[in-house]
Amino acid sequence: MFLHQNRFAARVEHMHTSMQRIPIMSTAPVIEHGRFAAKATVGESFQVSATVFREGHDELACEVVATDPTGVRRAPVAMTLQGCGVSQYAATLTPDVMGAWTFEVRAWSDPLATWLHHTEVKVPVGVDVELMFAEGSLLLDRIIAEHTLTAGDLVTIDNTRAGMCDQLRPIRARLAVALGHEIKEIFSRFPWRDLRSVDGPYPFFADRTRALFGSWYEFFPRSEGAKRSKSGVVTSGTFKTAAKRLPAVAAMGFDVLYLPPIHPIGEVNRKGPNNTLTPAPTDVGSPWAIGSAQGGHDAVHPDLGTLKDFDDFVRRANKLGIEVALDLALQAAPDHPWATSNPEWFTTRADGTIAYAENPPKKYQDIYPINFDNDPDGIYNEVLRTLKLWMSHGVRIFRVDNPHTKPLWVWDRLITSVFATDPDVLFLAEAFTRPPMMRALAAVGSQQS
């Protein structure tokens, strides 16, 4: 039985079946069969569990092993049985660095534990006494054959064999020798793992702590420090004037400052108050109608200042313990540079015009939605370039505008690319949608919603 498992272990491990030799099932946390990463944050402990069992009554053991983002395999963590009758084992992992981790569950047959259990059950009641001690002697032979032992170890083994096999001694005395601390200590240093089985690896991602929650405050830089003259002319607020508001934001306990789009605003089909299509010359339009002759998603609206002014704003916020979150709205005004350079990125209607955004009965004539199917690689490369530009200027949080209206592959590909080099970047999905879409947005990388 358990004495001979090692003879067949190598052969069994190379069999190709859907079921491991030691079945490992219902491993968690696993998202969509491992297609997506489970989530945790640095320093956050979470449970890994699995149903592990085998045929018959022989003993088994299992552990979970994590591999960190650098490819270093961490020390195994023993899994313990949770309750009786369900064969569920669990252990706790606590990632200590950000990035993409994996874990795997390992299980094996434990011939020593099997012998100890059978011996403790049978010998005291006089069942198979000599057979159990003989099988224990074979285990001693095996450990001598497979490992390099010290002289002290060999003495302990000889004494154990002599004591438990001495039929002139009382059975309980022989049992005490067989189960003695000294021999158990030797076995603990040289554990056997017969019939090894592995489930995984499965991915999990360790975010920084801010991914769990943040206290967000929103303001329009244009409104902070804006002035209206006696004649009614409005002078826009800037990053410099908006920075004066930062201490008050920090004093209220906020640690994330969200800015709506700070880019040039389209002039074609610009909206006025109450969604009118007849704006006054001084109406600035909707910040979400991104892009004009002054630039697109990679530019700062001239009314707000320069890119250097933005950098100074971010630095001042950071000194106060505030992170700046930028809006990521993948859409374009009719006069966005993309509309000229890459008209194929949009949907052309039967009359040759580019389709504007609609959410019946609402119409957004000042916004062109992007058609991600016409040139997916071109769009991906441009959006990734834009993201990395703002990341290089200190933005580590993006509030993604209406992500549920874009194909999920867009976020899967973009966020995966960002995490590969910058695992500290966070994405909040601003989505009002059905649970399946919300779950999918989380699966592809959005930490918040």
For each predicted feature, which ranges?
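Non-catalytic, glycine-rich low-complexity segments
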Residues: 8-55, 114-147
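Aromatic-rich carbohydrate-binding modules that target alpha-glucans
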Residues: 55-94, 118
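Extended acidic/polar, glycine-enriched regions
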Residues: 80-133, 140-195, 200
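N-terminal carbohydrate-binding accessory modules
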Residues: 190-212, 323, 345-357
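Aromatic- and acidic-residue-enriched carbohydrate-binding clefts of CAZyme catalytic domains
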Residues: 213-237, 265-312, 340-377
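Hydrophobic faces of well-ordered beta-strands that scaffold small-molecule active sites
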Residues: 215-217, 257-259, 324-326, 398, ...
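Catalytic domains of carbohydrate-active enzymes, especially glycoside hydrolases
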Residues: 241-263, 389
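Active-site-proximal helices and loops of the catalytic beta/alpha 8
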Residues: 401-449
